[in-house]
Amino acid sequence: MKTTLSHALGNNFLGASPLWYKQVVIAFLIINPIAVVTLGPFVTGWLFIIEFIFTLAMALKCYPLQPGGLIAIQAVLLGLTSSDGVYHEVNKNFDVILLLMFMVAGIYFMKDMLLFIFNKLLVRVKSKIVISLIFSFSAALLSAFLDALTVTAVLISVGVGFYSVYHKAASGQSSNKNHDHAKDDSILPINTEDLNEFRSFLRDLLMHGAVGTALGGVSTLVGEPQNLLIAKVAGWDFIDFFLYVAPVSMPVLACGLLTVVILEKTAWFDYGAQLPDTVRDILNNFEKEESQKQTNKHKAKLIIQGIVAIILILSLAFHIAEVGLVGLMVIVLLTAFNGITDEHQIGHAFEEALPFTALLVVFFTIVSVIHEQHLFQPIIDIVLHMPTDSQPIMFFIANGILSAISDNVFVATVYISEVKAALDAGTITREHFNTLAVAINTGTNLPSVATPNGQAAFLFLLTSAIAPLLRLSYGKMVWMALPYTVVLSVVGGLCVTYFL
């Protein structure tokens, strides 16, 4: 039957997404101009935020770049922000864009070493609780000195590596180098249950690791971009920052790790999945086969990757350059010394990060709408006019709520600027300023684990190649992050109230 042009256009719009989803996006695009005229730009601005969050929540139905991008373009056309405003937001976050372009690609060229190390760990450590603690604590420790996105890229690379190894074996195609692990058509029926259990197992580890990046990232000056911003305004160096934040960050870290143990013991919130024995055997055999196949050339590659990994950690820990530029150095070193000179081989490394980079620019457009329309101003004004003794906890709560919706750096910038202005005007003391700065820092970092749009690392995980493989949806991430959200928010809030 011949398809009409209008039918073809309808089918092409958002590709293979469900019809209801296409209709919802079209409804958004029709409602928005009407809302601007009838409800005004302020209310419509909040409508745009809700619509964008919806596209993130439906990431498994359609990659958010397309529907979210259409909404962002319309925001500019309707005058809720300007192209200059978007450019300003993008320019302000250029270091994050550089990081995604180059650092994530750099990690791609380290995947052999990462799989080698983590495979040994997974095969040798039998206790799921111990493995979960290792993932969470390692992510926290690394995120205290490296960028959370870099650490998340490592977790994703390891997860995809494990999944592809088992998926090949479960399909009876262990020797097929071109096997597509995104398709389950070839999975042998006997392996279906183990595959689903392995998915749950990897999902648990990735969520523990992702939350670990927040646990570590809050504690040091270089842990998160907003930490640098707050420290600069407050005039704190690395040691000052750590000591000021420690009364909150250290108890939160301890309680976060305790939460890992409780979740794995109780199997609450969909945690507690075990590594099936058949999967462990396959990973064990894979390790033995890889060890037997190792030539001097392969060993040389692993040595180079190990050396470059050390250079990477030292470069980021001492902040010798912007993270993205360090990532570019990693790409050059690994490809040069491991003989990867084919353009197409190099190109594969950028496939994972560039769609997310584009999505992040779309996100910055929504942040620009928030900025231009002063959508957060009423909340900011309420907190700033509260009694002095209740301000720290209210700053913590307000920053947490707003950071779960918007960009952490944007929220931190708004609040720390207002608090600094109050200090300069003599309205608050230096001691109170330091307390509020810690409340702002911990507020933007801890409760924001509630949603994927609250943490760039979470959003990266949600929109990465591994999310559909492990059936990790927006709703699933929110559900699995919920116990952490409660623990981090309550413990963080109590520490801000009583320990500062």
Curated annotation (Swiss-Prot):
Topological category with respect to the lipid bilayer: Multi-pass membrane protein
Disulfide-bond pairs as recorded: none
InterPro entries: Na+/H+_antiporter_NhaB
Transmembrane portions of the chain: 13-33, 34-54, 62-82, 97-117, 129-149, 242-262, 306-326, 350-370, 392-412, 449-469, 477-497
GO MF terms, alphabetically ordered: sodium:proton antiporter activity
A GO term from the CC aspect: plasma membrane
Entry's localization field: Cell inner membrane
Catalytic reactions on record: 2 Na(+)(in) + 3 H(+)(out) = 2 Na(+)(out) + 3 H(+)(in)
Source organism, top-level taxon: Bacteria
Coiled-coil boundaries: none
Predominant localisation class: membrane
A Pfam family reported for this protein in Swiss-Prot or TrEMBL: NhaB
Key words, A-Z: Antiport, Cell inner membrane, Cell membrane, Ion transport, Membrane, Sodium, Sodium transport, Transmembrane, Transmembrane helix, Transport
Annotated family: Belongs to the NhaB Na(+)/H(+) (TC 2.A.34) antiporter family.
Function field: Na(+)/H(+) antiporter that extrudes sodium in exchange for external protons.
Listed PANTHER family: NA(+)_H(+) ANTIPORTER NHAB, TRANSPORTER ARSB-RELATED
Protein name: Na(+)/H(+) antiporter NhaB
Lineage of the species this protein comes from: Bacteria, Pseudomonadati, Pseudomonadota, Gammaproteobacteria, Oceanospirillales
GN (gene name): nhaB
